[in-house]
Structures are given as structure tokens and as C-alpha cells.
From Swiss-Prot:
Protein localization: Cytoplasm
Cofactor(s) named in the record: pyridoxal 5'-phosphate
Protein name stated in the entry: Serine hydroxymethyltransferase
Native species: Streptococcus pyogenes serotype M4 (strain MGAS10750)
NCBIfam families: PRK00011.1
Signal peptide: none
EC number: 2.1.2.1
Amino acid sequence: MTMIFDKGNVEDFDKELWDAIHAEEERQEHHIELIASENMVSKAVMAAQGSVLTNKYAESYPGNRYYGGTECVDIVETLAIERAKKLFGAAFANVQAHSGSQANAAAYMALIEAGDTVLGMDLAAGGHLTHGSPVNFSGKTYHFVGYSVDADTETLNYEAILEQAKAVQPKLIVAGASAYSRSIDFEKFRAIADHVGAYLMVDMAHIAGLVAAGVHPSPVPYAHIVTSTTHKTLRGPRGGLILTNDEALAKKINSAVFPGLQGGPLEHVIAAKAVAFKEALDPAFKDYAQAIIDNTAAMAAVFAQDDRFRLISGGTDNHVFLVDVTKVIANGKLAQNLLDEVNITLNKNAIPFETLSPFKTSGIRIGCAAITSRGMSVKESQTIARLIIKALVNHDQETILEEVRQEVRQLTDAFPLYKK
């Protein structure tokens, strides 16, 4: 009998699936990736995630598993835990959360009860679905009240947030964002939380790599719980991470993840997280993170100097920025689709005090982590900004759009994603 194990590779065994995978590899290779939540992992991360660890079930935690034969995965998970603790200066780490959303769900479960009041950043102001959107579990389970940004500066107004916290008396305050381009003052957030007797949870999913490298202030000394993804600026596999310095909360977090929300952990993904944490502990990672910030600032500055576009909040301190494109094209959705046609990938995004529907939006969101992983610098970042402007301003001129496609191809050829 021919065993399934004899099917040595995807290309030979499942050509239809392989073609789709290969097409995605080609798309990544020849498109400029500017989606702020995406990055490009190393081959070592991919190798760990594709290892035999995918075969092993390991419910519970190292040294206390429900199944036998876990001595090897215990080593793997412990490596990931210890590296995460060292990387972020935290006393405790849970690396089992399958995603950032599940990490947030576990944090909520550890800190509050269903129906409790939570103060979180409004989605339209730059927050995340899990920070209280009514269509998300967070908004359905807890009583979320949204805080926004200042109408004039489009930045967080900590005095206003304090007054709002006094008014609603939340059990928990959530800081962190998915589309906020400015540095967040976590010390001020902790002071607000302490003033009203609330817990502080920080979702640092977008900025985790910058925090790890020390180029963005860390929330770990101030938050009761910090959650994150392990991809985005951290450049690891898609997954979640939870940190705390409080032993009692660490126990609650572990119980919330397992058995509260999940069964067996994905040890192959945890191995890939361990690789990514080791990569981020290398001194060279700080140079990478600083390059992200430099590239993002350089790209944003090009838009700031063009009065046909409006840079939200006037600039950026991290890996991301938002641009109001409605002076040159009807909405962000059309901008996203047009740029897709010239092989530049980004996403439509609501801007503060948005007037269009979430399916259209006035803005686009741009992030520079992925192009920095390819080795692009300030010069290329400025070039990409000019190409975006060229395409959007001339969105009905196919000859010019073809010029942009060719210039994009020249850039991607000069900075190959995975050298053959």
C-alpha cells in the first residue's frame, strides 16, 4: 500500500494547491507590500513552522501536560517563553494564544466579567475590532465606551481621556491601536487607570517589534497586561502573545488561554515564535526597527508636502500613517483597488471623524515594515510615495499607470524577497 507519507512535496501531490501557493509567492515577490499589519518572515521562521512539531498535541503548559511524549515540545515552548520575557523585560509570558484577537479575549477574561465597562479606542479613531466594536465579541460581551482623538490635532488627548474615564468609571482601560501613527504615552494611561481604579491593558500588536528594539516606549512597565501579535513589526509567524509582571494575573491568563479559550497549542507555530524572538534579540534587529521608523517618516513626508493629500495628525512616530485621498480620488476603496492594479498593496482605512462608510472610507493606511524587510531604505520609500501619488492623481490615464507598474517592477527586482 502506498503511504501518504510517500507524497514528498505539495507540487507533485497537489498541483492545484501548489499553483495557488506559487502564485502568492510571485505576488509577494513582485508587489510592494504596504499593509501595516503584514511583514515578511525569515526562512528560519518558515522552516520551524513547517516542522514535525505540527504532529504533536500538548494540552496545558510545559511540565504539566495532559498527554505524554511532550518532553521535546516542552523545551520548544520554554525557549519561546524565556525569549519573550527577555525580549520585552516581562516577568511572565504566555505564547500559546493563536492570534492577537484570542490574546485580547484571554486578557479580558483574566481581568473583567461579562458586562463590565471598558474604555477603549474607537475603531474610527484608530482602534481595533477587539477594542469594543459592536460587531466583535468584545463589544457583544462587555460594555465598551470608545475614546477618540482630538478633533484639531488628531492625536490622543490624555486630559480628555481622563475626564471620560472619570465619567464612565471603567473596570478596564485598553490602550493601543491598529491605525494610529503617533507614539502612545503608556505612563499617562497608567496614571488615568490608577485614578479611576481600573486595570490597564495595552494591545501592542502593531508596535511590538519597535518596542522590542527599544525604538518605541514600552508598555510593559506600566500595563497590568500587554497583548500582542507575533507578526507585524515583530516579523514572526502569525500568532499571539501575552505578557505581565503580575504573578496572580499570569495564572489567570494561563487559565483563560487553556482551558478557557483554546485546547492544544500549535507547537509548530510556537517554535516559529521562538525563532522570531531570537532574531529580535539580535542587535541587528534594532537597526531594522529604526529603519522602519526612518522609512515611514520619509514616505509620510512626501505626502505632507503635497497639498492634494492630507496626512492624518500631520506625521508619524512609528511604522504607519494614514492619508486622506479624497481630493484626488473618490474614496479609499477606489484608491486601494487602483494601487492593486499597479502592484502596490495597501488598504482603505477610516480616518478620524470619518464621513464615508467603512466599506469606502476617506483614507488609506500605509506601513513600511515589509519593504524594510526587503532592504529598502529612505530613498526607495520616497520613490514609492511618489509612485502612489502619480497613480492616484492619474487614475484614469492607463499609459501613466503602466509607467508606474514598470517602476514598481524595477524596485521589486532590485530588492528580491527571498533570494533564489
